[in-house]
Swiss-Prot record:
Stretches for region Disordered: 161-182
UniProt name for this protein: Retinoic acid receptor RXR-beta-B
Subunit structure: Homodimer. Heterodimer; with a rar molecule. Binds DNA preferentially as a rar/rxr heterodimer. Heterodimerizes with rarga.
Entry comment, domain topic: Composed of three domains: a modulating N-terminal domain, a DNA-binding domain and a C-terminal ligand-binding domain.
Length: 422
């Protein structure tokens, strides 16, 4: 694959030399590249995707119904150590604790992992010698050792069972909705949307030329890519996915995620797209882009870009406006796009699929509670996903989001952002 030419400012020359936008997302960390026409669906996938080539003789089975002793080399945490400092850390992986869960200060990821393990009575295997490191970065690498560490640190199986019994005693409908929201809280999804929105507002400006939509879009894309990573890190359980898979998921869905965001932002204006920079791109300007000057290709691109802009307005912006889609629903749709179990190269496809199913359940529960008179609202929301997918592929072919941050490949940039704190 040809490398991009030396970078110039997106402001002065947003498209000075253009390869396929997919070249910007080619792997620089050894991850599989993104195919030209990736297959990303929104339905369930088959468990046959999860294959194992491990030797049976190297696997050590353990059932969650057994209280397993700490493995060799696993050190306990002193009660006077940093785990009980003012900023409590997860006793399992060292991430930030969200409180005491099942008897131990732990993060949401380890809490959810332990609860799922106990409730479903899952059995795990270790590929190595039962001494795998369990920390923030590698907690998903070995479920066997992670579960052992949960027990070693003092998590109580009976606490999970008591919690489940209490839930069963509640009203059936409430229990169902409460359980779904507990697994994937829509409040946290909304917080992710609003946190990024506020950050965008702080850094937005209107100094660009409203007569140069290509430059404006490139400027906005640069800002949105920064905020996209921050948004993803705030989505519940995304940080629980292995880091390499986080990069794969963002690389597979970044175009659809950004399109969904600016489409929803544009429902307050008519026949325009409202960019993250605060600038408006009117419909008329996209039909007179003269993009052949930018792309050095056939002039037919100009008409195609104008038609693509019309699709964004009619299939996304107008539909969102007509149904008055709120930010919680937008956040859930974007989370569904993010948790894509069909993304090529994933090592945790089944876990990602489970997270997507939890978003589905939480969104459906939210629609029933918030809009009880609109029985078809949940289905109507999901119908926006195929249109978003189709438009996203077209955008990759034509106009959006190339040369976003100079010569830095997107994979490397995403890796740096994901490793940085909030």
């Amino acid at each position: 694959m040809n490398s991009l030419p030396p970078s110039t400012s997106a402001v002065s020359s947003p498209v000075s030399s253009v390869d396929s936008p997919l070249s910007a997302v080619s792997s620089s960390i050894g991850s599989p590249g993104v195919p030209g026409t990736p297959s990303i669906g929104y339905g369930p996938i088959s468990n046959s995707q999860i294959n194992s080539s491990m030797s049976v003789s190297r696997l050590h089975a353990v059932s969650s119904s057994d209280d397993v002793k700490p493995p060799f080399g696993l050190k306990s945490v002193s009660g006077s150590g940093p785990m009980l400092s003012q900023k409590r850390m997860c006793a399992i992986c060292g991430d930030r604790s969200s409180g005491k869960h099942y008897g131990v200060y732990s993060c949401e990821g380890c809490k959810g992992f332990f609860k799922r393990t106990v409730r479903k009575d899952l059995s795990y295997t270790c590929r190595d010698n039962k001494e795998c490191l369990v920390d923030k970065r590698q907690r998903n690498r070995c479920q066997y050792c992670r579960y052992q560490k949960c027990l070693a640190m003092g998590m109580k199986r009976e606490a999970v069972q008591e919690e489940r019994q209490k839930n069963k005693e509640r009203d059936g409908d409430y229990e169902c909705s409460s359980s779904a929201n507990e697994e994937m809280p829509v409040e946290k999804i909304l917080e992710a949307e609003t946190a990024v929105e506020h950050r965008t507002d702080l850094h937005s400006d209107a100094t660009g030329s409203p007569n140069d939509p290509v430059t404006n879009i490139c400027q906005a894309a640069d800002k949105q890519l920064f905020t996209l990573v921050e948004w993803a890190k705030r989505v519940p359980h995304f940080s629980d996915v292995p880091l390499d898979d986080q990069v794969i998921l963002l690389r597979a869905g970044w175009n659809e995620l950004l399109i969904a965001a600016f489409s929803h932002r544009s429902i307050s204006v008519k026949d325009e797209i409202l960019l993250a920079t605060g600038l408006h791109v009117p419909k008329e300007s996209t039909h007179n882009l003269g993009v052949e000057a930018f792309f050095d290709r056939e002039s037919s691109h100009s008409a195609e870009v104008g038609a693509l802009f019309d699709r964004v307005l009619t299939e996304l912006v107008c539909k969102m406006r007509d149904m008055q889609m709120d930010k919680t629903e937008l956040g859930c749709l974007r989370a569904i796009v993010l948790f894509n179990p069909d993304a090529k190269g994933l090592t945790s496809s089944s876990e990602v699929e489970l997270l997507r199913e939890k978003v589905y359940a939480s969104l459906e529960s939210y629609c029933k509670q918030k809009y009880p008179d609109q029985q078809g609202r949940f289905a109507k929301l999901l119908l926006r996903l195929p249109a978003l997918r189709s438009i996203g592929l077209k955008c990759l072919e034509h106009l959006f989001f190339f040369k976003l941050i100079g010569n830095t490949p997107i994979d490397t940039f995403l890796m740096e952002m994901l490793e940085s704190p909030h």
